[in-house]
Amino acid sequence: MDAASTLTHAPVSQPWQSLAQGLGFVNEHEGYWWSKLGPPLGKMMNWARYSTSEQYRVLAFLYKYLLPACGPKPGDDGELFWKVFISYDYTPIQLSLNFHNGKMTLRTANIPISDKSGTADDPINQQASVDAIIRQERVLPSQDLRWFNHFASQYFFDKDTAASLKTKVDKLRVQQGVQCMLSHDFPERDVQCKVAFCPLWKAVATGLSNKEIIWDSILGLGDDIIPYKRALAVLEQYTSSENAAKAGVRPVFFAFDTVLKDNYKSSRIKIYYLTTRTAFNSMVDIYTLGGLLKGPDIQKGVEALEVLWKAVLNVPEGWPDDKDLPMNPHRCAAVIFNFELWPGAEFPSPKAYLPAHYYGRPDLEIADGMDYFFKQQGLDGVYGSYKENYLKCLSEVRTHRTNSQPSTMIFLFHSKGPMPTLRCTTSPSYL
C-alpha cells in the first residue's frame, strides 16, 4: 500500500491525519510528501502550543499551496527527482520553530519543484517558483508581486539560455543554483511570506561577482530602494573591506517580504552572506560588520552568541577564539549570516546561522546546550525544557519513520532579547 492509501485509511488521531483522510490527495506524490511532512508538522505545532483550530489552518495552507511544490516523490532506488540545497539531505521543504517574545512560531522554507524541473521545459528549475507564488495569491490578498516580478526579470532565463548555462557547471553546482525560494511564517491567524533569489546562474552567464549582481538588481528597484540606502551603504562598506576578505565572507543571496500589511507595510531586504571560516573571532567580526555595528544591543548579542556557539557546536575545550574549528570537508559546511535592512534604518540588523549539522555536538548535547542557553538568557521559565520537548517530538516523529534532526541553529538578538530558531528536516534517507 502506498503512502497516500496508508494515510487515507489510517485511524485518525492528529489534525494532519484527519486532513489527509478528509481531502485525499491529487496524486501519489503529494501523498508521499504529506506522509513525511505531516508527523513533524504535527509534533512541532504541539510543541509550539498551536491550538487545534490553528493547526488545521496552517495544515490546510501547506496542503493546498506548498504540497504541490514538493514535486515527484523519490524513485524506487530512493533517489530524489530534483535535489535541492535547502537542507543537507536535499529535500524540498525545511521546517523550523522560531522562539521569540515568549512565543514559538512554525516556519517553512521551500524550493518549489515540479515534474518539469531539470527537463528541457525547465532546465534549471524556474517555473515552479512562479507557479507557487501565483497559486497562493487567492488566500494572501495583501501579496505584492512588484518586487518579485522585477527580480524574476533580472535573474530568470529563457529555456534555451538556461539549457546552455546548465552545461557549463558540474552537477553539484546545478543543485546549488537555486533560482528562487519561498519561506512562510505562521503566527496566530496569519501567514507571512518571503521570497529569496540567488545570483549563481547569472554569475555563470555574466562573469560578474555575487555582490555586483545583487547590488545592481536591488538598486534597480529605483525609488523603492531610497529608504534602504543608508543601511545598504554600511553593508557595502564592510563587504568591500579587508576585514571581510580576512573572514572569507561574501554575499550569496537575498530575500524580501511579499505579504505587505501590519508590521510589514514595507518589505524588509535580507542579504545573506556565507563563510567557511569558523573561528569565533571571525564570527564576531562578521556579526558586527567589522565594528560598524555598535551599541549595547550589539554587545549583548555578541555575548549571547558566544554562549550559544559553545553550547551547541563541538568546540574543543580551551579552543582559541582566533582559530578555525577542525574542518568539515563537505562543500556545504559553512556559517551563514544575514543582514536585515528596514526602510529608514541607519544600520542593518545581523543574524547568524550556526551549522549544527556539520559542526554541532550530538543531538542530545545540543538539546542540553539549548536548555543552558535559555537559562543563561532567563528564558527557561518561558519556553520550558527544550530537551524534554525535543525528545518528545523526535521520538514520536520517528514512530512515523521520519527523520527530524536539527541541521541549523539560527541566532538573532533584538533589543527585546535573543531569537533562536531550530531548523529540522524531513529526510527520505532515513526511511
Curated annotation (Swiss-Prot):
The UniProt record gives the binding positions of substrate as R107, K194, R268, K270, Y272, Y353
Q: Which InterPro entries match?
A: Aro_prenylTrfase_DMATS (IPR017795), DMATS-type_fun (IPR012148)
Q: What is its EC number?
A: 2.5.1.-
Which amino acids does the record list as binding L-tryptophan?
F85, I86
Task: State which pathway it belongs to.
Answer: Secondary metabolite biosynthesis
Give UniProt keywords alphabetically: Transferase
Q: Does the keyword tRNA-binding apply?
A: no
Q: Does the keyword Transferase apply?
A: yes
The protein's matches in CDD domains, at most eight in alphabetical order, are given as: PT-DMATS_CymD (cd13929)
Supply one GO BP term. Answer: alkaloid metabolic process
- GO molecular-function annotation terms? transferase activity, transferring alkyl or aryl (other than methyl) groups
Stretches assigned to coiled coil: none
Q: What does this protein do?
A: Indole diterpene prenyltransferase; part of the gene cluster that mediates the biosynthesis of the indole diterpenes nodulisporic acids (NA). Nodulisporic acid A (NAA) and its chemically modified derivatives are of particular significance because of their highly potent insecticidal activity against blood-feeding arthropods and lack of observable adverse effects on mammals, in particular the tremogenicity associated with the paspaline-derived IDTs is not observed.
| Family, similarity comment | Belongs to the tryptophan dimethylallyltransferase family.
Quote the PANTHER family the UniProt record gives: INDOLE PRENYLTRANSFERASE TDIB-RELATED, PRENYLTRANSFERASE ASQH2-RELATED
Q: Which NCBIfam families match?
A: arom_pren_DMATS
This protein is called: Indole diterpene prenyltransferase nodD1
Q: Which organism is it from?
A: Hypoxylon pulicicidum
